[in-house]
Amino acid sequence: MKHIIAVLIENELGALSRVVGLFSARGYNIESLTVAPTEDASLSRMTIVTTGSDDVIEQITKHLNRLIEVVKVVDLTEGHFTERELMLIKVRAVGKEREEMKRMADIFRGRIIDVTEKSYTIELTGDSSKLDAFLVAIDRASILETVRTGASGIGRGERILRV
């Protein structure tokens, strides 16, 4: 099962490396990883997407909590949360394809952010399944390049990740 783990970590040299090393040393897979500063300049927030049984996820959170730089760990998938990911996709858009690509972008509430004679670059946001559905819906042969940020997540309602 997919889990989104939010980690508050001290902004220190090598902290990210130790977290990634922990996953690597224990054979855990990281599907995506995002890191950004928080409202507190001394802390960063990591969002780690990984898969595993409940026992594996419990072990991951225990190991993360043992790292000195880690301030707090929350498995967002244990409660209600909002997940978003950004995808930029460059597609061939020539002739009849232009209108079809524009229509598909509109259906998925994407934005065309760059236009050339032969291509569109489309920006899409949503959960991973929405972005995957867009990729399935368009002709694979028209995809020139794709980049995705990986998931970011936040608890819903009063649920917050703070020290």
Predicted regions and their residues:
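Long, contiguous binding/interaction regions
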Residues: M1-R45, V49-V163
